[in-house]
Amino acid sequence: MSEQSRPIVEVAVGILLKNSSNVLMGKRPDGKPYAGYWEFPGGKLEPNESVALALCRELMEELGIEISLDPSHYQELMIIEHDYPHAYVRLHVCLVQQWQGEPVGLEKQELSWQSLWHPQLTVDPVLPAAWPMIEYLQAYLQK
């Protein structure tokens, strides 16, 4: 199926960056498509919801953290589309560099801080759409 014959699912994705080198990834829980795969936190936009508000809501629901939408703490980095067997998604990828609270897996998901600068991640498997995000962020931070 092509994107034209499937609805596009809008998703807000938050890359939490700690100490300019570590990003937080979560393991998809059982019962979800791609269960056991690692991804960046986030979720679907609700009808008429902005990316910023969806990101705030999702990070609170999934991790119990509050984020500021101040431009010095948060920014939308990129938009990518990915065609998964279960959904065609448009991912609004946001960099979050400051938050309140300590991230906890409130949906029973495992969490892991991963170094952007090691040759490979220590978690596996990783959702296919996460790789372009990682590569973009590495290039962005090296500017």
Map each language-model feature to its residues.
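Active-site-adjacent beta-strand/loop module that shapes the phosphate/pyrophosphate-binding cleft
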Residues: 9, 18, 77-102, 116, ...
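Generic C-terminal helix-cap and adjacent flexible tail
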Residues: 4-6, 138-143
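A generic structural micro-feature
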Residues: 5-8, 37, 85-88, 105-108
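Conserved N-terminal beta-strand and adjoining loop/helix that marks the start
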Residues: 2-23, 44
